[in-house]
Amino acid sequence: MAAPTHAAPPHAALRPDLNIISEWIAPDSRVLDLGCGDGTLLAHLRDTRQVSGYGLEIDSVNIAKCIRAGVNVIQTDLDAGLSDFDQASFDYVVMTQTLQAVYYPARLLDEMLRVGSEGIVTFPNFGHWRCRMHVALRGRMPVSRTLPEEWYNTPNIHLCTLRDFESLCAKKGIHILQRTVVDYAHHSNFAMSLLPNLLGEIALYRFQRIK
């Protein structure tokens, strides 16, 4: 009897930011997805790029979805670190919309580049002009399309701007290989490329340790 297969989702149906990330990942590579959610990205990479790997997730509902999709998943808290994985176990370590929600983001970046050759992260840009205007004119923490929760019930505890992230990378000897800045609908334009920290709502970075 033939082994069961998992149908690949149509490429157009993939969430736009995950679509961008998938283009950064080489075929036949090993991927660790931190905060993998329902496993959509890993399932897509497995079916379209023959990628192997694992997802780390804390939510039991998402873990069940990963299992149904045939995605290798481990239940864990990212703030506990990645000590279960050896150095250079993966080609890529991915973390989408999670960096700002962990207690120790700087330490986690180090761990990403310990277990992986390259890291990929995405996060909401707190330097976007709407966030700046909200604080300047209302004197309150912003609520926006990319930051929809009030300050008292948000999972985001370490919000940053593009400049903040790039400054941290420079301090840690991390080389940025690619950067894409998009709006809420994951579209980009020429003005955004000129003023990314002011006009970009979501940042996507691919990086590695300076050798």
Give the positions of each predicted feature.
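Conserved alpha-helix/loop element of class I SAM-dependent methyltransferases that forms part
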Residues: 12-28
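Short conserved loop adjoining the S-adenosyl-L-methionine
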Residues: 81-87
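Glycine-rich SAM-binding Motif I of class I
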Residues: 39-43
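Class I SAM-dependent methyltransferase "Motif I" SAM/SAH-binding loop
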Residues: 35-37
